[in-house]
């Protein structure tokens, strides 16, 4: 199985490291190709880099580890490629404000998961995961005892 990780910030790096440590193949794509290349070099032979389009095409699972607004844009651009794929969304409906803080980008009562699910094509398998843990916890708490709890949700059986 191959997992594409789109975005190699804190969440993308953590997910990629854990997958490779578990023996899984990852394909990395990022806005700044040099960041993806550096991570692939660190991770070794189970990691490679390519374009977003090729990463999605070649993968069984696609993790979009990007800001929510970027995720919406990527889904609009690549929706047809996502049919039959497992799409993992760790995003939260926030954006950076002018002061370096974060602000909610959706009205109260509307979730990022429901928005993303509505943007996916028929045949995509949506999983909402990793958004309840900060990147630091995701990086440090996996594969430890006692085990951390990671919530996820999907409509698939």
Task: Give the positions of each predicted feature.
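Rossmann-like NAD(P)-binding element
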Residues: 44-47, 52-100
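Short beta-strand and adjoining strand-loop segment in the mid-core
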Residues: 101-109, 141-157
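NAD(P)+-binding Rossmann beta1-loop-alpha1 motif at the extreme N-terminus of oxidoreductases
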Residues: 1-45
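Rossmann-fold dehydrogenase core element
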Residues: 106-130
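Conserved catalytic-site region of short-chain dehydrogenase/reductase
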Residues: 96, 133-137
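Short, conserved loop/helix-junction motifs that constitute active-site signature segments
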Residues: 78-84, 119-121, 144-145
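General beta-strand structural signal in soluble alpha/beta enzymes
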Residues: 49, 88, 125-131
């Amino acid at each position: 199985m191959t997992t594409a990780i789109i975005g190699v910030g804190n969440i993308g790096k953590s997910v990629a490291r854990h997958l490779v440590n578990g023996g899984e193949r990852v394909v990395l794509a990022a806005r700044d190709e040099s960041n993806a290349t550096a991570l692939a070099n660190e991770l070794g032979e189970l990691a490679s880099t390519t374009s977003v389009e090729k990463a999605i095409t070649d993968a069984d699972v696609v993790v979009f580890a990007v800001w929510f607004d970027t995720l919406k844009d990527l889904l609009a651009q690549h929706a047809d490629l996502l049919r039959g794929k497992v799409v993992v969304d760790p995003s939260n409906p926030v954006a950076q404000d002018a002061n370096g803080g974060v602000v909610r980008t959706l009205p109260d009562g509307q979730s990022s998961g429901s928005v993303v699910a509505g943007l996916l094509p028929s045949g995509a398998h949506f999983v909402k995961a990793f958004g309840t843990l900060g990147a630091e916890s995701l990086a440090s708490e996996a594969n430890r005892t006692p085990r951390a709890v990671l919530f996820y949700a999907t409509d698939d059986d």
